[in-house]
C-alpha cells in the first residue's frame, strides 16, 4: 500500500511539474533578423498559478535545446517577481519556439551587463550602462554646491553620455579611478572616456516645456529608486522637485530602462502641468548635422567630438513625435534639437541614446540614421508572443 501511495505521489508530482512547463512561440513579422529585443513574460500570460515563482523558471530554445539567458524583475517592489525577461533570436519573417520550465540555467551569466546605481562618492550622480553605452545624470548635492558657489557641483537635468568602447561594465571602475586619485575618466586609456559636455543643455534626452516660445526645465533629480540590474535590463526611477514654466506648476518623474544590446535608453516620463514635452538633443557648438524623420519617428544629430564623431538620437513610438524644433541660440549650452511629444494620460514614452564612432559600428551619419530607422521599425512592430495551451 505504501509503495502504491509513493508511486501515486510521484506520478502526481511529475504531472504537476509538466503542467507548469509552457511552450511559447515568438513570431517576427519583419523581413529582418531580430535580436537584442526583450520579451516580458508574466505569470498570467504563461497561465501559471498565482503562487508560482518566476525566478524558479528557465527557458530553452527548442530548435537546439540550449538555455537562453533570463532575468526576473520585481517592478513594483512588493517582493514578488512580476516579469521573466529574455531576448530571443528570430530570423526574418519566421517563428521560433521556446520552452519555459521549472529549472536552472547552468550557464547563466554572472556578469551584470545592465547596471545602474546612485553614486554618493562622486557627489551624487546616478549612472547606468549596458554592454554598448553608459550615461549619468545629477542629484541634489551637486545642485546645492553650484547654488552655494562650491567648486565641483553640477546644475542640470540634462543626460550625460559616457563614451565606453568595451563590452564589460565600467561605471564602478571609472568612479573608483577618479575618486581614488589614481586616474581620470576624462582621458581615454583604452576603455573610453567622458568628454561629452552637458552644462545647461538637455544632453541626450533631457526634457523641457515650451511656453510662448521659451523653454523651461527642471533642476537636478531629488530622489532615486533602483528597480533592477542584471544580464538583460537595468531600470530605475528619478523624481524631480516641482518646477515652474511661466506660471505653470510642473511635476516630473522618469522611469528609465536600458536593455542589453541597445544604444538607446527607454524613458517613460510622467508629467503634469503641460500638454506636451520637448525632448532635447544638445547641439553643442553647432558644428554637426541634424537629421529628422517624423514619419519614422526619429531625430538625430551627428557631430564631431574631439578626434572622433558621435551620433545622438531620439526615437518615439509611431505617431507620437508630433514635430521638432531646431532651436539655435547664442546663449551658452541652450541650443538643442527638440522633439515635441504630446502627453497621453500625463505620460510620454521615448528612447534616446548615442553611437560613438570609436565605440560602435556607426562610422557616419547615414549608418547611425539607418540604426534609428531600424530601431523605430522594431518598436512599432514588436515580436509577437503566443503561449501554446
Whereabouts are the PLM-identified features?
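Beta-strand-rich recognition/accessory modules
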Residues: 82-90, 316-389
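Solvent-exposed N-terminal domain segments of exported/luminal and surface proteins
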Residues: 104-214
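Polysaccharide-binding surfaces and accessory modules of carbohydrate-active proteins
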Residues: 21, 278-327
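Acidic (Asp/Glu-rich), glycine- and aromatic
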Residues: 252, 263-292
